[in-house]
Amino acid sequence: IWPESLSFSDRTGANGNATKDGKLSYVRIPGWHGRCVPGEGFTATDCNQKLIGAQFFNASWGGSAAVEAERPWEFMSARDYNGHGTHTSSTAGGNHGVVATGPAAVFGSISGMAPRARIAMYKALWSTEDASTASGFTGDLVAAIDQAVADGVDVINYSISGTLTNFADPAEISFLFAAAAGVFVSASAGKSAWRNLSSRL
């Protein structure tokens, strides 16, 4: 996640839109157990009352040294290399009224679906250098899911494709346990039509 994005600021200006130095507009959440783990390009102070947690998982890969040996461009932190985690987090829970930048600037201001939601990032995938894709190990994905539940999240947004072959893989089982703990799981189902079939809804 890119914590400097106004989508994740906990402050608002006089117009009610997110700013870096306005009035604090979020309060602490009772019962929250998450942490803000510092690392490369990410300090503990990058978290706030909107971005309330940031952790990264790579033990199944062999730890940070193993990831760095294979993907030296990556950030050994919750910082996003290819932008996917930032995009999906801001789409789900980014602040209201944030001025879009880059090619999206034509849209003016943007908002997440649940703009008052808090965000906790659990990074378990590591990007290719061209930022076209990312990969990781199932053990790290499961560790991230389980940690999110233990930390006290209400919703897990899992925007990492899907499976057509194995509905009982370890990540799916972790989602069942998350649901049993009262956590709503929103998981993508992939971006390709199954056997060239598509729905015409």
Model-identified regions with their sequence ranges:
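Generic hydrophobic/aromatic pocket-lining and core-packing "Φ" positions
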Residues: 145, 175, 197-198
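Subtilisin-like serine protease catalytic core
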Residues: 1-137, 151-154, 166, 179-180, ...
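Short, well-structured alpha-helical segments in soluble
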Residues: 140-152
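Hydrophobic beta-strand scaffold residues
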Residues: 182-186
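Conserved cytosolic headpiece of P-type ATPases
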Residues: 10-14, 174, 187
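Charged helix-capping and loop-helix junction motifs
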Residues: 169-172
